[in-house]
Amino acid sequence: PTIYHWPEALAQAADMTVTCPGCSMHYYYDFIHPETEAHHCPYCTTPRPQVLILESYRWKGTDTPLELPCWRYVREIPPGSELTVPRRVFDEFLMLDSDTAEVLISSGDEGILIKKSDHAKADVSVAADSHPQRGFQTVYSQMKIDRATPDVQFWMFSNMNSPRLVKCMISGSDK
C-alpha cells in the first residue's frame, strides 16, 4: 500500500496477532504449526492462548448477505482479564480515534461481561444464544452473557457512520 494507507494496514496486521505466553513473541492468530498441525507458536510451539476473535461485517440490511469481514480483531483473553475493543471494530478506520475504547469485554468462569467504555460513541446491541431474551438487546451500561461452554459465540451490532455486525468468538487454547 501507499504511505497514505500504512496506518490502516499496520493496524489490521497488528490486530490479527497474539502474544505467545511461552516466549512473548507475536504471531498471526490463525497460524498452524507444521510439526504439531495445531495453533501453536511458530517460535517455541507453545499452544495458542485463549483468544477473543471479533469479525466485523458492514451491515447493509436484512436483504443483503454478509460479505467478507472488513476488519478482524484478535486478542488473548485470560480468565479474569478485561479486554478493550477499539472503535475501528465498530466503524471505519480513522487516524484520530480508531484506538478509542468503545467496549470492554471480560471473561470468567460464570460468563462474559460486556461494558460500554466511558468514551463510547457507538450504540451497541448484543445477541447470544445463552442470553435469556432472544434477539439483540441494547447495552446501556453493561450486559452479562452466560458461559455454557468454553467456546462462546455472540453478536454485537453498532450503528455508527457505517453500521457493523460483529461476530464475537472466544476460542480455547487447544483450537
Segments the model singles out, each with a brief description of its role:
Residues W6, A101-S106, E110-K115, A120-V124:
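Short hydrophobic/aromatic patches on the structural cores and recognition surfaces of FHA
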Residues C20-C23, A38-C44:
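Short cysteine-rich clusters marking metal-coordination/redox-active sites
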Residues V51-D109, T138-V139, N161-S162:
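N-terminal beta-hairpin/loop module of FHA
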Residues A13-M16, H33-E37:
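Residue-level signal for mature regions of secreted extracellular proteins and peptides
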